[in-house]
Amino acid sequence: MGYFCIFALAMKEKNLNTIIDLLERSCSKFPDNVYLWEKRDGKYQPSTYSEVKQQVMYVAAGMMAVGLEKGDRVALLSEGCNAWVYGELGLLYAGGTNVPLSIKLTPKEVVFRVNHSGARYLIVSDFYVNTIRQIEDELTSIEKIFVIRPSHVVEGKYVSFDQLLSSGKVWMEKHPGEVEKRVSSVEKDDLANISYTSGTTAEPKGIMLTHGNYVSNVLQSDSLIQVPEYFKVLLFLPWDHSFAHTVGIYSFMYNGASLASVDFGRSPMEYLRNIPLNMKEVKPHLLLSVPALAKNFKKNIEAGIQLKGKFVQWLYNKGLKVAYRYYGTGNHEGKGMRIVL
């Protein structure tokens, strides 16, 4: 049955073979829909699908201008932000492969993954650039380092991400059609991502995922949980996480919906404090979580309910029971006798 479902989904969207196709489809269907929300100057600012694609094209051109060839690997070490999406999609448009890195990695772990993957370039946010400077001499394959929102002057092999965008714009004007030619060469069996295991029991393994892998996962998740185009998600899971990556970034993109990043602040602790504050600002329709985090959410919610008295607690428990019966497995709305409980 599983293979039949995958085949049926592929036939339904037969022109979707790559992650690039997912963005192109949404830019065609939902050009003015907001895709990304990012907090700047104290307020969440929107970027539409057409605006995102323009930035992606500039990144692709900038990467090609510095010599990125099809199949080259680019490591990405950053908290979730607009530039994370621009960077990954841009390097994919240029035919590259992303090597997303967890922001929780130690310097030694970063060195292993970058060198093992053979990444030629590195995109890093300003918050983690000092970590990279400490191990720069050990990153033997890295030729250029692009810094997102640098707080200090960058020089040498360090280049600001904004400079990558502006140089890409100039390069596109001087080389019309070259980015489009590279884009057309990307196929579903091309490598899109090398996702490393944690390495808790042995050396980390690089899981090689193709464009086709991601597209099939997006279509399968969409068949289970429908995401209307007006939906917003506040994506507080690490963006290199495979769940957040597939469902948060790409499933929402496929449906013309939008995702918001958490305001990182000045430290990981400030990031955690900003999550509930940003939830009130963004008002997301959906949250993605993992068991440990969901358990903490539930614990805090139920602690607050207990403070409101026994009657409110009874209403909560009754509503929870009704919801479980109505939604069944959680894959769809209640049907049949579930409606009357």
Question: Model-found features: residue ranges?
Answer:
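Conserved AMP-binding/adenylation subdomain of ANL enzymes
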Residues: 215-340
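ATP-dependent adenylate-forming carboxylate-activation enzymes
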Residues: 78-79, 99-114, 126-131, 259-281
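Conserved AMP-binding A3 loop
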Residues: 46-50, 192-218
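AMP-dependent adenylate-forming
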Residues: 22-47, 153, 201
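A short helix-loop-beta submotif of the ANL/AMP-binding
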Residues: 73, 79-99, 103-107, 115-121, ...
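Structural core segment of the AMP-binding/adenylate-forming
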Residues: 22, 93-167
